[in-house]
């Protein structure tokens, strides 16, 4: 990946020489990272073979690891002494594996306010959305200041009352607007799921990422520290 590390036997020797001059520093392991574990296996194998060749001179007993989530699933030959499970711990299937993963994270907020707009009324900054009919609009207490990506403006949907509701207008710093005309039972205080399951419906990290033009890793890392975090075990 050309980020950090060594690329040749000579560089390995330089590192070992430097370590020999620092007796307080003990070499305990070596690792690599696949550039495209979800892509061309031939290139991944080439990376792996290079890693094994360069680490061959290292002291016996060190820990070698190469495989993160996708590689640990696709490439059994790359598991070595340990694996680095990351996104798979969140239940996201980076590659099609047949493993029945369950999403471990949701992102939720509440309906703060509901109003009815006449046809032709515009909403939000820049007036980017115009009501095509009389429309019930819910204001939700979340925005890009909370980590709900602004790039999802006008494309994302949320779950209210077990139904998908489109985000309308631009995502604001602290609020978003949602069309709840087709959810007549929606009311202030209702839970709105931005990412996660509600009833029989689910918005996955990959789906939210597609709306925002990014990847699932980013949407799962986006919630701001000001967003309360609740941890559940066995539903409690």
PLM feature spans:
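Active-site loop/helix belt of alpha/beta enzymes
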Residues: 1-119
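C-terminal accessory subdomain/extension
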Residues: 116-236
């Amino acid at each position: 990946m050309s980020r950090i590390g060594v690329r040749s036997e000579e560089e390995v020797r330089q590192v070992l020489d430097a370590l020999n001059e620092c007796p307080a520093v003990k070499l305990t392991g070596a690792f690599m990272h696949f550039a495209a574990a979800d892509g061309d296996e031939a290139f991944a194998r080439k990376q792996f073979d290079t890693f094994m060749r360069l680490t061959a001179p290292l002291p016996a007993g060190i820990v070698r690891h190469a495989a993160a989530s996708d590689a640990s699933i696709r490439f059994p030959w790359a598991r070595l002494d340990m694996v680095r499970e990351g996104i798979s711990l969140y239940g996201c299937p980076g590659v099609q594996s047949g493993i029945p993963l369950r999403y471990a994270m949701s992102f939720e907020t509440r309906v703060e306010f509901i109003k009815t707009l006449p046809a032709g009324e515009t909403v939000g900054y820049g007036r980017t959305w115009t009501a095509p009919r009389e429309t019930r609009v819910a204001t939700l207490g979340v925005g890009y200041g909370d980590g709900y990506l602004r790039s999802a403006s006008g494309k994302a949907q949320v779950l209210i009352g077990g139904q998908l509701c489109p985000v309308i207008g631009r995502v604001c710093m602290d609020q978003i607007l949602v069309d709840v005309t087709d959810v007549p039972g929606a009311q202030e205080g209702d839970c709105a799921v931005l990412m996660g399951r509600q009833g029989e419906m689910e918005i996955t990290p990959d789906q939210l990422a597609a709306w925002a033009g990014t990847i699932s890793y980013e949407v799962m890392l986006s919630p701001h520290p000001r967003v309360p975090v609740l941890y559940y075990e066995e539903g409690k």
